[in-house]
């Protein structure tokens, strides 16, 4: 199959990629054996339309790094960014403690321009539902925040939490993992954020996911696979299955 963009007249747009891209373990499968680290992002972005950056959880890159990311990727590429642990694990969404970190995060991400995609706030498993805290935190977010929330404690899976997210225009992240019960696939915003974290997906699994995502009614859908060597192929296959039900923004390699 050629690298041309493929699309469909349906309203949804599916963006599929991996959690990270700079893995030497991908050499010989996704990357050429002799690829240099500085060439990986360009290679990746020629084949997939989005990437989830996780190391921002530990440290926010300098603006010069963000500028280089933007320059190394084609028009239409999107970076999903995991929010700093200072916000989610240290401040634990307490607005008065997290305010400066939230402002710093979004100020820096503006460097990416239109290539900035969603911002993922991944909460620790020990943090239980606290609706007043969540509501106050949501008021901190800037306009056009594009925020997704991954709750890893089941107490958060409740209608009043979904209502708070809807009111703020934030999305409930669906995360499929081996070690927990995933949340329901509840649309709380016009766009969806899905993390598929199982080690193995069959073609049938991916086809079922494409159908399920199309049925959710989102205008845009971001999907990220775990950072295994199989992740790029899973993302490409999901986009191929999505052609029949969603407009695919991306490039499919031969």
Residue ranges and their predicted role:
Residues 1-254:
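Residues lining hydrophobic/aromatic ligand-binding pockets adjacent to catalytic sites
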């Amino acid at each position: 199959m050629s690298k041309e963009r493929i699309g469909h007249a349906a309203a949804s747009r599916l963006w599929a990629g991996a959690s990270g891209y700079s893995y030497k373990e991908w050499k010989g499968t996704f990357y050429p054996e002799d690829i240099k680290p500085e060439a990986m992002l360009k290679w990746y972005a020629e084949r997939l339309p989005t990437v989830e950056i996780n190391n921002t959880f530990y440290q926010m890159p300098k603006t010069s790094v963000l500028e280089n990311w933007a320059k190394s990727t084609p028009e239409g590429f999107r970076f999903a960014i995991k929010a700093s642990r200072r916000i989610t694990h240290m401040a634990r969404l307490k607005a008065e403690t997290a305010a400066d970190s939230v402002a710093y995060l979004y100020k820096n991400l503006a460097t990416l321009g239109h290539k900035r995609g969603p911002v993922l706030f991944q909460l620790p498993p020990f943090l239980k539902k606290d609706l007043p805290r969540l509501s106050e935190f949501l008021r901190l977010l800037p306009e056009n925040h594009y925020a997704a929330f991954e709750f890893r404690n089941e107490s958060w899976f409740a209608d009043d939490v979904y209502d708070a997210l809807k009111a703020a225009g934030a999305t409930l992240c669906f995360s499929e993992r081996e070690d927990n019960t995933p949340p329901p696939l509840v649309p709380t915003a016009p766009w969806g954020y899905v993390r598929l974290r199982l080690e193995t997906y069959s073609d049938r699994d991916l086809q079922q996911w494409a159908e399920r995502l199309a049925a959710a009614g989102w205008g845009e859908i971001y999907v990220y696979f775990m950072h295994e060597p199989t992740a790029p192929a899973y993302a490409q296959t999901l986009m191929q299955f999505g052609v029949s039900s969603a407009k695919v923004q991306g490039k499919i390699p031969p």
